[in-house]
């Protein structure tokens, strides 16, 4: 069974890698980041991650050759960059090439002060990618089916509502550190149903049972506060969204 699973994942990896290289425009998706600047986005310093600047700045964010680059602007000071537009039901996809160390996150239906359903981008020891977390929502849910070890090539599967679909030994093949990998998240309804993927493979699925957050909000990316990550970067490109709201 493990051999069959490994072959399936390897095939999925090779197919998805070829697709990413060509970067075709998926039906129904529209880009929400241009190649030059943050038009359509703005930096918010209203989250708790901007306390080091007394909420005056929200980290350092620039766009260079189509890549959104973020870091702490002073030691310990992060924040979010959030879309001007608000979204309800949608699927968002992007490519990531972050340094291993800074804590980030993909915020779904985010408020200006960073309350959101988060698809985690905790790209550091003991962190995970694409688990689901209630940012500013009492820390619930907090579900992940694996965590990183001390090295980016090491992962440990954990018990979760959705089993970890990748063999631990195959992780270095499935996830290509310091290359572009695709992350994807879908959120529909309220209470929301959230699904996440890495490189085309479903990682987590979560059904919330209560209405605890507005049905619309921004799409945001985070640089976490704390520590000193002024010389470590998060990088995102090819950010695109597919609207899934039911037509009236």
For the regions a language model picked out, list residue spans one by one:
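Positively charged n-region of N-terminal signal peptides that target proteins for export
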Residues: 1-8
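Bacterial N-terminal signal peptides
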Residues: 8-18
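Carbohydrate-interacting regions of secretory-pathway proteins
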Residues: 21-248
């Amino acid at each position: 069974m493990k051999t069959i699973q490994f072959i399936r994942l390897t095939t999925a990896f090779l197919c998805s890698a070829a697709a990413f290289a060509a970067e075709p425009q998926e039906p129904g998706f529209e880009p929400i980041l241009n190649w030059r600047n943050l038009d359509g986005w703005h930096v918010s310093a209203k989250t708790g991650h901007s306390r080091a600047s007394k909420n005056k700045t929200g980290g350092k964010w620039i766009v260079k050759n189509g890549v959104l680059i973020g870091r702490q602007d002073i030691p310990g000071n992060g924040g979010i960059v959030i879309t001007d537009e608000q979204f309800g039901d949608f699927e968002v996809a992007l490519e990531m090439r972050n340094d291993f160390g800074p804590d980030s996150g993909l915020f779904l239906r985010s408020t200006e002060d960073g309350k959101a359903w988060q698809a985690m981008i905790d790209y550091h020891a003991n962190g995970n990618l694409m688990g689901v977390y209630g940012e500013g929502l009492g820390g619930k849910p907090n579900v992940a089916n694996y965590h990183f070890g001390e090295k980016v090539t090491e992962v440990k599967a954990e018990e979760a509502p959705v089993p970890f679909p990748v063999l631990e030994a195959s992780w270095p093949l499935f996830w290509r550190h310091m290359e572009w990998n695709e992350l994807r998240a879908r959120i529909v309804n309220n209470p929301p149903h959230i699904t996440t993927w890495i490189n085309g493979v479903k990682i987590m699925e979560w059904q919330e049972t209560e209405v605890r957050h507005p049905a619309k909000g921004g799409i945001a990316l985070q640089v976490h506060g704390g520590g000193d990550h002024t010389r470590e970067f998060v990088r995102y490109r090819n950010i695109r969204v597919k609207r899934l709201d039911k037509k009236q």
